[in-house]
């Protein structure tokens, strides 16, 4: 578990540094969004209200930082941001208590060792403590659709939970020794079967299957309970060709391509939700990257609002 946490921290630190060097061109898009938040405040709407609120589906609790919750709350207040805080099982009490004290800022999610003999009991305990879902599931030894994982999915289905899965390429943490890790076990195509077998689970895929964006998008298109984020390296490596995503999220949701979407939004990009997967200092840069994508792909304002928070607010029934 410690190796896993180290890998996650290293990845977020690296991606945060990489993204920070590529975002000057997108500052204008975020500036407009930030202005809308300021206008909301001037209209007498408190920062903790749902108006203009960002919901970040991909914030990893960092147990190595004793002031992490306090530091997060400062960022949360400044950006008007709520986090689905992905929490190691051993840190569940800290985050559960923080979520009780700050219900409009922290939504507790737990990740468990799928190979622990008491993993189902761990899931049940998280549920009893008020956790709202699982994530980020990753570094699995078998594909996500392996029946050995089904008892966990069955509990999540029973609870109507949201479950976040890593999808796509994954970093390599060890170079001089064998490592039982393979991206092929975490391909986005596996999420289709989970979504169909367990229809009460809302399936979130991190990183939009990087680099299998086409598979991720088509699975999200035909499964109303599947969404993806674009955290990680995608918006950095695609910064000069962001409009390419219009060819991936291509459908209109009308006519022969009509599918069930949040609020019947016909824009294909509504199947994306915001996720940062970076350090606290890097979240604002990822927001800018999303807005650069919106501008490049001419995503309409109502769809932008759903991506940045509206969809998850409705799915989770978050307080205002």
Write out the residue ranges for each language-model feature.
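Alpha-helical scaffolding within the catalytic cores
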Residues: 42, 68, 90-97, 118-122, ...
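Mid-to-C-terminal alpha-helical segments outside catalytic/metal-binding sites
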Residues: 2-57, 66-83, 93, 258-273, ...
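Acidic (Asp/Glu)-rich catalytic clusters
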Residues: 46-50, 73-78, 95-105, 122-130, ...
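Histidine/acidic-residue-rich catalytic or RNA/ligand-binding cores of hydrolases
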Residues: 65-69, 95, 173-177, 213-222, ...
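Conserved, mostly hydrophobic/aromatic
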Residues: 156, 228, 304
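His/Asp/Glu-enriched short active-site or ligand-binding loop at hydrolase and phosphoryl-transfer sites
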Residues: 227-240
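Active-site gating/metal-coordination segments in enzymes
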Residues: 90-185, 234-235
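Hydrophobic faces of well-ordered beta-strands that scaffold small-molecule active sites
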Residues: 55-59, 83-86, 108-110, 134-135, ...
């Amino acid at each position: 578990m410690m190796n896993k946490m180290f890998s996650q921290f290293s990845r977020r630190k690296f991606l945060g540094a990489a993204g920070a060097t590529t975002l000057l061109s997108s500052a204008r898009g975020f500036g407009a969004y930030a202005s809308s938040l300021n206008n909301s405040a001037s209209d007498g709407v408190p920062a903790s209200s749902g108006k203009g609120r960002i919901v970040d589906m991909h914030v990893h609790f960092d147990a190595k930082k004793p002031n992490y919750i306090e530091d997060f709350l400062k960022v949360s207040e400044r950006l008007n941001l709520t986090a689905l805080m992905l929490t190691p099982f051993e840190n569940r009490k800290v985050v559960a208590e923080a979520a009780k004290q700050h219900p409009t800022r922290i939504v507790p999610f737990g990740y468990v060792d799928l190979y622990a003999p008491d993993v189902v009991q761990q899931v049940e305990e998280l549920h009893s403590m008020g956790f709202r879902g699982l994530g980020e599931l990753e570094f699995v030894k078998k594909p996500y659709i392996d029946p050995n994982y089904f008892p966990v999915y069955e509990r999540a289905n029973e609870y109507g939970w949201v479950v976040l899965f890593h999808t796509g390429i994954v970093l390599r943490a060890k170079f001089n020794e064998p490592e039982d890790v393979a991206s092929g076990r975490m391909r986005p195509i596996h999420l289709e079967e989970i979504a169909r077998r367990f229809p009460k689970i809302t399936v979130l895929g991190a990183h939009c299957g990087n680099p299998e964006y086409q598979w991720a998008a088509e699975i999200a298109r035909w499964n109303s309970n599947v969404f993806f984020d674009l955290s990680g390296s995608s918006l950095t490596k695609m910064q000069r060709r962001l409009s390419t995503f219009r060819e991936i999220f291509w459908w209109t949701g009308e006519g022969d391509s009509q599918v069930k979407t949040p609020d019947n939004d016909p824009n294909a990009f509504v199947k994306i939700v915001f996720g940062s997967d970076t350090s606290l200092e890097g979240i604002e840069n990822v927001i800018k990257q999303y807005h650069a994508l919106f501008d490049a792909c001419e995503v309409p304002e109502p769809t932008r609002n759903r991506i940045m928070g509206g969809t998850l607010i409705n799915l989770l029934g978050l307080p205002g």
